[in-house]
Amino acid sequence: MNRLATGTAMHPAMTARTVTRGSVQQAVGGTAAMTQVALTARPITNMGMPGTRAVGGQRQVLDLGYYTSELRNLITATNKEAEALSKQTIELQKREGQLQRQQESLHAIQREVDELQGELQDILYSQSRLSENATLEDLRAEATEAESAASKTRNEANIAYKARVDAEERLRKNEASAVHLRTEMEAQIESTLGLQAAERYRSLNDENITLKQKESELRKELQEAAAVAANAYSFCTILSNYTSGGSISGQPGHIAMDERISGVDTNIQKAITLHRQIRAAKRELDAYKAKIKAAESHDPEQSLKQQLRNRFRVEQMETQSLVEEIKITESGVQQRKKLLEEITPDATVTITKEQKDLLKSVIKAEAFLVEFPNKKLALQTSIKQAQAEVVNLISRLPIPQGTVSVPGEENPGAIEAQLQQKSRELDRTTDTEMRVNAELRTYGDKVSALTDSLERLRADLRDAESIENVEAEESTLKTKLTSLKAMHEEETKTLEKSKGALRLIEDQIAANENAQLLRNLLDQLSANLQKKYAVELFIVQKTIESCYDEPKKKCLQLVSEINNILMGG
């Protein structure tokens, strides 16, 4: 019977030799011979597969079956995760649909609420007007006026919208033309002067724009100061005329001067009123300017328009400065041409070959210095690309078959999957623990309730220990119950009699005309009381609104101060 050779069996030629009579047996020594080698401690390899299979389950062979089983486990884990994710996505989609439906219903409810609030405001306004003894015709007239005002506002809004659309179209055209002009100017600058000159030109233009803005602001401030000074000068001249006229008016024979003084007084009053009106107008103008600035700051279209206008102005300034620079360069070129024409007849010295080579080398060095940064960047990018390709190739390399691996080693993806699974199990256990704790609390509450009921029953049993006392109490309770029943029957009879008498009285009252008149009078009285209360509230509100004591005091104080100033001046 043939027997397969295992991986650990000895070769037939390597069998132990028989010991002869003259041979000497020596003990084997050394660290290699004394070390004890276990079969399970040997490394895992792909060599000697039949022998390792014959040994049994002591060693694990990294063959095709091992890797296929690992891949199947990973595939099942990924499929489970994909199913869980798909379930979560379905639930989220359902929640999103529910939320969208709730939002739509909320918007519909808000619209209905707004409509109802508008109707309520209309009803309250009409009720207040009717309480003010207004007629339906007045209300209809007010409604028609409101409709006409609304139509006017709609027309104005439509006109404003059309103007806005036209302005946007004009703005787009201006933007396109400005962009085209700017590109042409930039190309011309770069072609004629170079990049450095163009950048310097732009920076100077920006500085020029800022300086012009500051100049315009200073001019405005100067104009305002001049206007204030002119007003003060006119006011001083009026006061000087008034004082000079006052000194002469007391003398006899100056009737015309007195008339002039009276005219001056009127002029002073007019000047004061005009000065106040001018101040009020300036305040209103400042308020309107502030509102316009706030609206422009909040309006992105206005800011965009302002930016485009500033750009257009900058480009205009750039073109003007560019034209001036071109003129300057042309004049410089003409001067250089003249100098060259003067120098050429005097240039009798010939350039040697060495000088020409030196000039060429200098030109090449300058070109290399100019192109060096670009070449450096290109080389760095190529090095980075090569490193990335090397990393990709290393990642794509297969696992070597003959390498030694440690038993029990797992894929990091599988470890992560196990970690996620353990975390899920931990979450489930925490949920179950919380649920169990809640159930234990409910059971504890039930047990406490049962113990309370048990204590009550025990107390009742203690009270009812003696049967005789219970029977005596039962007899007394029966007698009380019979007496209460008799009293109840008597009271029900009296109640029925009183009900019959009440019905008769109600019928008599309903048939009586005086009672009906009294009811009508009571209703009218309640309505009149409500009207009176509303009128009183209206009177109180109007008295509060029409109280001008404090403004009157302030006005009188201002008038007295003005008079004191004028008389003192």
From Swiss-Prot:
Full protein name: Intraflagellar transport protein 74/72
Organism in which the protein naturally occurs: Giardia intestinalis (strain ATCC 50803 / WB clone C6) (Giardia lamblia)
Swiss-Prot/TrEMBL keywords: Cell projection, Cilium, Cilium biogenesis/degradation, Coiled coil, Cytoplasm, Cytoskeleton, Flagellum
Location of this chain's protein in the cell: Cell projection, Cilium, Flagellum; Cytoplasm, Cytoskeleton, Flagellum axoneme; Cytoplasm, Cytoskeleton, Flagellum basal body
One GO cellular component, as annotated: intraciliary transport particle B
Regions crossing the membrane: none
Assigned protein family: Belongs to the IFT74 family.
GO MF, any single term: beta-tubulin binding
